């Protein structure tokens, strides 16, 4: 995964999420929408064949926190949820 910033303003961030597809992009988008300071979050895949693994995101906040802060919080939430799934599986497997 690599992030390529396209546009950065005080409360707007546009970037490509290289190496990912709808699977991770949709998860990130859903978690971004959970943040009360996000006024818009969405992504597109500009060409389904040529850019299938390069979603383009746009994140807009209310200005109380930056889009970068929102993304950091979202990444931590995704990490925490993945850890919870791992722990639940370990419990089921008796590990």
From Swiss-Prot:
One of its GO terms (molecular function) is protein dimerization activity. It is an enzyme of class 2 (transferase). GO terms for cellular component: cytoplasm; DNA-directed RNA polymerase complex. It is found in: Cytoplasm. GO terms for biological process: DNA-templated transcription. It catalyses: RNA(n) + a ribonucleoside 5'-triphosphate = RNA(n+1) + diphosphate. Its EC number is 2.7.7.6. Pfam families: RNA_pol_L_2 (PF13656). PROSITE patterns: RNA_POL_L_13KD. It comes from the Archaea. Keywords: Cytoplasm, DNA-directed RNA polymerase, Nucleotidyltransferase, Transcription, Transferase. The keyword Transferase applies. InterPro entries: RBP11-like, RBP11-like_dimer, RNA_pol_Rpb11_13-16kDa_CS, Rpo11-like. Part of the RNA polymerase complex. NCBIfam families: PRK01146.1-3 (NF002235). Belongs to the archaeal Rpo11/eukaryotic RPB11/RPC19 RNA polymerase subunit family. DNA-dependent RNA polymerase (RNAP) catalyzes the transcription of DNA into RNA using the four ribonucleoside triphosphates as substrates. This is DNA-directed RNA polymerase subunit Rpo11.
């Amino acid at each position: 995964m690599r992030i390529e910033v396209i546009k950065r303003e005080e409360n707007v961030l546009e970037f490509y999420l290289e190496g990912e597809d709808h699977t991770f992009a949709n998860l990130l988008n859903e978690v971004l929408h959970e943040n009360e300071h996000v006024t818009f979050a969405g992504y597109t895949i500009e060409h389904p064949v040529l850019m299938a693994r390069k979603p383009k995101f746009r994140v807009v906040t209310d200005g109380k926190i930056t889009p970068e802060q929102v993304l950091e919080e979202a990444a931590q939430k995704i990490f925490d949820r993945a850890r919870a799934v791992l722990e639940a599986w370990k419990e089921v497997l008796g590990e």
